[in-house]
A protein has these predicted regions:
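Alpha/beta-hydrolase active-site loop
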Residues: 101-124
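Short, surface-exposed "cap/lid" segments of acyl-processing enzymes
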Residues: 30-94
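The feature captures the conserved acid-bearing segment of alpha/beta-hydrolase catalytic domains
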Residues: 170-277
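Conserved hydrolase catalytic core segment
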Residues: 144-154
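Alpha/beta-hydrolase fold nucleophile elbow
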Residues: 125-136
Length: 285
């Protein structure tokens, strides 16, 4: 198990199962929901805003304690509510750097569990503007969940959106540590079940807005994930891109730029498409 440390968030509330969670419980602070022998952590910050941002974690190192809850500072500076979700699969083993919020052998697919939990938390805020945010590996979850919430915005930053290839070390570690996939046949079976390309999975009827930010200096992720998704889904999804150079390689978006982007997207009086344009995103039809 990965080392657990929640001291920075103070004393939280523990729920013995998802059945004990409801919108009435979605108050400011740390909430930990037991899912079997695993823990799902959610950090809520109620800033009395009409906009709520749901965040998903990025890749973490071996030394990073669990949970990783993203966005407390940048959403605070942007003045919006926060619902930050940690990936329980990352807590299973320190070698697991990413779980993409897919689930694991013990709990099965995570989305059927997490979706109603998120829905209750979101409903507690009654937001006029809803944004799902994820950087890198978190971008997969941001896009995956935003597609289920009409009129929401998926703000993805340098995302990995195609897990169907499954050929890198992060995926191999996730498969072995989280699913116990040993041997070629079990590995391929489980990998094909969980390793989904979102370009193929998101329904054409999804009524959300994809604000896709990418660093042009990160050519590998741009060419293998961002560009193919945009090319294949521009015809049936509302997609707008912002391509900036932030440095060579897989580097995060500069903090000030992220805060300003969220501020622009978070204005509910401005239609989503216009807010995206104001934030520098361009739609190619």
């Amino acid at each position: 198990m990965r080392k657990r440390d929640t001291s920075r968030w103070g004393v939280g509330k523990l729920y013995p199962s998802p059945a004990f969670w409801s919108r009435n419980e979605a108050t400011d602070g740390l909430h930990t929901i037991q899912i079997g022998n695993q823990l799902l952590d959610i950090l809520i910050r109620d800033r009395r805003s009409s906009t709520t941002v749901v965040t998903f974690q990025h890749r973490v190192s071996v030394r990073t304690p669990f949970p990783t809850l993203v966005g407390e500072k940048f959403t605070g500076e942007a003045g919006v509510n926060l619902i930050a979700v940690a990936d329980p699969s990352v807590g299973l083993d320190p070698e697991v750097s990413l779980g993409w919020y897919l689930g694991n052998r013990a709990i099965g697919h995570l989305k059927p569990i997490l979706h109603p939990i998120l829905s209750e938390a979101i409903d507690a805020f009654h937001p006029k503007r809803l944004i799902f945010f994820g950087n890198s590996g978190g971008g997969y979850a941001a896009m995956n969940y935003a597609a289920d919430f009409p009129n929401s915005i998926a703000l993805t930053v340098n995302p990995r959106l195609d897990l169907s290839q499954g050929q890198d070390q992060d995926w191999a570690t996730y498969m072995t540590k989280c699913h116990g996939a040993v041997g070629r046949t079990p590995y391929q079976r489980i990998s094909s079940e969980y390793g989904v390309n979102l370009a193929d999975a998101i329904p054409s009827s999804a009524q959300f807005y994809a604000a896709m930010y990418h660093n042009t200096g990160d050519s590998e992720f741009l060419e293998k994930n961002h560009a193919p998704f945009v090319k294949s889904r521009t015809g049936d999804l509302y997609i707008a891109e912002r391509l900036d150079f932030d440095g060579n390689g897989h580097v995060p978006i500069p903090r000030d730029k992220l805060i300003e982007t969220v501020r622009e997207l978070a204005t509910p009086s401005v239609p989503q498409s216009e807010a995206m344009k104001a934030a520098g995103f361009i739609r190619h039809i």
